[in-house]
Amino acid sequence: MMFSFFKSPIVSLTPCKTISIPDVYRYISGPYAQNRTRNLRSLADPQKAAEYKRSKFDYVTFSGVFQKRTDADLVAHSRLLCIDFDHLDNLQEVRRILLADTYFETLLLFVSPSGNGLKWVIGIDLQQASHEQWFQAVSNYLKFTYQLDADPACRNVSRACFLPHDPECYIAPRLLPELKQVLQTNPEVEELMNNLAATNIIVEQLNNESI
């Protein structure tokens, strides 16, 4: 489940390295995008906010490794699909719903750079269906089951996902061993692991309340 990481701005189409979900968790939970996320959310003008995000935020292509960020330059699919939910009035409720869903395992879940949306990363089996078919199937499932609308732009395999700061970012428990390896060489290990433990406790409490 490896994919490409790109440095800002968005017009930079050549990736600088290949990373994994635990790497993204470390980035989002750590201080790397904290200031720019705060600055973005302070901008009242939507056009200025969009320009700031496109010029200042690093990003990934969750669905694969690329030579360049175009569908034609896909080197290897990651077997991951990232679904965007924009302009949510009930963000915390949607977060709880996604984490409690038993059909799709949530591998990573975090608040979007704007602060009013969510990014949901799940695994897909390309032997069963293509990337676009999976996107359509998942979108239909979300709409029918939860009345949630997925951003249609996510059907593109080269879809860029900006990386914000979210100290409550969720990562699947089965990825914790790999995450610990990623964190071992970094000074912020203790703080990140404490944040992770607190987040998992909150998720467990929310799931218990929904039963």
Regions found by a protein language model. Name each.
Residues 4-12, 67-89, 124-211:
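DNA replication initiation modules
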Residues 1-116, 124-137, 201:
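Signature for HUH/AEP ssDNA processing cores
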Residues 111-118, 155-160:
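Short Gly/Ser/Thr- and Asp/Glu-enriched loop/turn motifs at secondary-structure junctions
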